[in-house]
Amino acid sequence: MRGIVRIAKNRDENHVILLNENKSFVEQNYHGFHELTHILTVDEPGTTLNCFGNTRPNQNSYIEWLANEGAAEFLMPYKEILPIIRNESKTFDEHSMPIFDLSEKLSNMYNVSTVVVQNRISSLSYEIWQYLSGTDIDKIQLMSHSEQQRKGINVDSLLDIENKMFDACWNYEQTKVPIKPFFFYSKYYIFAVSSRCY
């Protein structure tokens, strides 16, 4: 269990948020904002919501998604992290994309876990692509993954691309079959991978 929120029945009552004390500070930080987002977005006075690590069959997946996105935006506003990602992306090359290093850096900056950072980078893949492609930060279109799918937009996250690069190098180390230079292409990102792994 991550936390519980009790939404007040009326203005005379207080909302209540309970967090799992066995979780670390950074986990409680995120879960607290997750529960706060429920208070701000669930319009059902008197409701109690129990939040677990994964959405359970009896939970509304949209409400949980909204609370996760809300907590991430409270703690790591996209207008703050996109410039950091762009600055860090200048160090990416054909041999490495140190997304996991970036995750550690952002984790420390925003007092959240690296998992939260990686989920945020993944959920902002389309927005990151827009920003890295030169779109002004105030003109970026925010769009859920389901909306992207409806519109035929398919953008690999930077984490996915780094994992593909890692897998290619791992396979080379295991088989010693030379890697042919190739490109990772995902409609929007193009990264060249050389025949050498570092």
Regions found by a protein language model. Name each.
Residues 1-198:
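Active-site hotspot residues in diverse enzymes, especially metal/ion-binding acidic/histidine motifs
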